[in-house]
Amino acid sequence: MRIPELVREVAAGSLSGIVVGIVVGGLGSRLVMRLSAIAAGSSVQGITTSNGNRVGEITIGGTIGLILFGGVFAGAVGGLLYAALRPWLARFGRWRGLIFGLGLLGLAGSQVLDEANSDFIILRPPLLNVAMFALLFPIFGIALVPVFDRTVHALDKGSLISGAFASVGIAVAILFVGLGLVTGFTALTSAPSSVELITLLLFVMILAGLAARALGSRLASAPWRLATYGILAAALLVGAANTLSGVVRILT
């Protein structure tokens, strides 16, 4: 049985996002951290970082943590956001991966480029570290597009295997988006941090984008297009302002 297009794309977003996230967000982050430690020089080697590790040491636990959070979780969220916003990104053609990655940097860059993270003080120069971590976002977007397209095509075969993979992808999407929304709205009852607010914004955008896509032909009308682009621009401005503020504080 052929899987509906939107369902396939949601599943493909989860699966391709995790794969690319593990490589770029997980292993890529580990590489950036290693380069940061080398660039900082011998004077900081052995100093304890904000996550409890020591500068210059590569631990199995730390690497697994990066792969799970920076790879599996962040990758799945990024892949689902791409699936949700795919119609809006299509107009950029072959540049859509780069545009998505840069947009993701604006929206969620503050999750990584956090001025409260003391590592940006310990590891110098800060400009190099900010640039390397920021570069991971467009790399993720560029790498995601071809993997996503191939995954969507593979899930369209109608076989038992493709159906099983689609089921896994949908289950991951429901789990992550559900937990993300519940956690985010629960945080609103107290004093949410900027990280919690941006995370909630990402999940709301995923849900809203998929809901808008489910409306089908209504999305093609001029009023709907203008409204949705306006909402996307507003969300991007909010996230980008927060990211830019964090970068300025790190560099100064």
Question: PLM ranges: what are they?
Answer:
Residues 1-252:
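Juxtamembrane/disordered regions of integral membrane proteins
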